[in-house]
UniProtKB/Swiss-Prot annotation:
Its cofactor is heme. The keyword Electron transport applies. It is a single-pass membrane protein. The gene is petA. GO terms for molecular function: electron transfer activity; heme binding; iron ion binding. This is Cytochrome f. The lineage of its organism: Eukaryota, Viridiplantae, Streptophyta, Embryophyta, Tracheophyta.
Amino acid sequence: MQTKNTFSWIKKEIIRSISVSLMIYIIARTSISNAYPIFAQQGYENPREATGRIVCANCHLANKPVDIEVPQAVLPDTVFEAVVRIPYDMQVKQVLANGKRGGLNVGAVLILPEGFELAPPDRISPEMKEKIGNLSFQSYRPNKKNILVIGPVSGQKYSEVTFPILSPDPATNKDVHFLKYPIYVGGNRGRGQIYPDGSKSNNTVYNATAAGVVSKIIRKEKGGYEITISDASDERQVVDIIPPGPELLVSEGESIKLDQPLTSNPNVGGFGQGDAEIVLQDPFRVQGLLFFLASVILAQIFLVLKKKQFEKVQLSEMNF
């Protein structure tokens, strides 16, 4: 009887351990997948503010260029390319989270007009798939299919990103019309300077939080510094913590002012935003334009033929 109870207890403990492990795994996977694509998804319902500013600029403080190329006009229910270019010097290295140097990553957000969305895989041509590579796009929100995000991905491979876009059809979507629409894009290269919670990353400059004399500098075992600033007027000491990454600019015994830079600025990346316009073209309007041009050409041909016929008649009358 006791042996039976022991086996029953062991069985329950095994089941409980498996259940706990499975829950931890699911939670960890969920948090990683939710946090990975772009920090802005966690804190902003819409990536573009009412002022037109894209919220990525709140964390990526340096201003850098970005370029977008789209067709001038597209027909309804058509797949086209939106090419986003995020240029930077491929030779530079950025400060990683552990303080070491590494290659830059890139990311982009593409804000399309309502109705435009990511093209389904079966509508993408082999040539376009080759340009896209192994990139995986996703919607900014499940209910915002017109806003697409990508990254962070390797800047060495994907400084030029091709988005496959499907245009809407006003015949099936009554909220869409044949008009000219704006497209907005934001692109960053490198890590940000501020995290979404407002704290600094190690990819930015650190300033003195007090004025005084640098009385002590302690280099931490895992990198970074503890800088003690002493104020002789009130015998107060302030300790500033510098994470691994930025290079120190001050030394012991040096007098410093409030907000004076203690480190260099290691940031080599930045964020930029741009826009473009695209026309959703009515195919009947295109057909009408072609018909009009054909009519003009035919009229010109008939006019030339008529003129030559008139000249022949005049010439025959003169000979007569």
